[in-house]
Amino acid sequence: MNLLSGLEKFGLKGDGELNILNDGTDTRKRQETRTKQEPVELTEKDFLLDRKVKCPICDKEFVVKTVKSSKMKRLEPDADLRPNHEYVDTLKYGVCACPSCGYAAMRRNFDHLSATQRKWIREQISANFKPVEEPKMETYTYDYAVEKYKLALVSAMAKKAKLSEKAYICLNIAWLRRAEMKTIPNDTPVNKKRLENCQKEYEGFYRQAYDGFIKVTSTEMPPYNGMDANTVDYILANMAVHYKDYDVASKLISRLITSAATSRRMKDKCLELKEQVVAELKANVN
């Protein structure tokens, strides 16, 4: 018998078995257990937040997306030390670009401008810049991110930045295009064209970065845009293997292996890279 029958007319549920000893604890426990058992599906947007930035050129504020670094889980980097993280490609969010005046730079360099550099930016960038409406997006696309890095590169050239800064921007663009290629299926003419364009940009900017950092190591003192000498040498060694510059790669590897400042982990990686160089040289002979 339903002891609570008749309550329906008041809009209240009168069905179910009456048990005044049940205070709802059992129901809450079942709900909590179900919640714990259901995994939370995290996506890229869960690791981002909006942050206001003030442009040092035009003094206008704008919003950029930034990564919640405390929540990031590092994954194994690529052979050339391109950083990888779970759920989000942090490199996409490495540039601040003012939508009003066109000035852009990597975050670590954005506010560091001399009076003369501000003048050069205003004359060479802002005077010719045509603002465009910023798209509303929860996460940055690779094309959008690369666009901002390219703005950072022309700003770096306009302000006569160190070669290490320009080379690092080129390296990041190459890394972004390489990551993008992994997301594009080679199944339609449109996608094949996208892959072809990405490959061209990847190789072009990777070469600029390689040539740039080779010169940087002989013309600048470390750190090179925040990277120590060993890190840059190791990146260059991998890039040299990519371009089959085996003499350059071998010299860099030997220097790293014999250096007391090189970590054990990096020395192990250098030994693996040395084996790769030897194997490729043997393959070329055969």
Task: Identify the function of each model-found stretch.
Residues 49-51, 94:
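Short metal-coordination and nucleic-acid-contact micro-motifs, chiefly zinc-binding Cys/His arrays
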Residues 54-59, 98-101:
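Short cysteine-rich clusters marking metal-coordination/redox-active sites
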Residues 60-88:
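Short recognition patches in nucleic-acid-associated and regulatory proteins
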Residues 124-153, 158-194, 227-239:
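Amphipathic alpha-helical repeat scaffolds of TPR domains
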Residues 165, 201, 205, 221-229, ...:
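Structural signature of alpha-solenoid helical repeat junctions
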Residues 172, 231-238, 242, 268-280:
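"A position-specific structural signal for the A-helix of alpha-solenoid helical repeats
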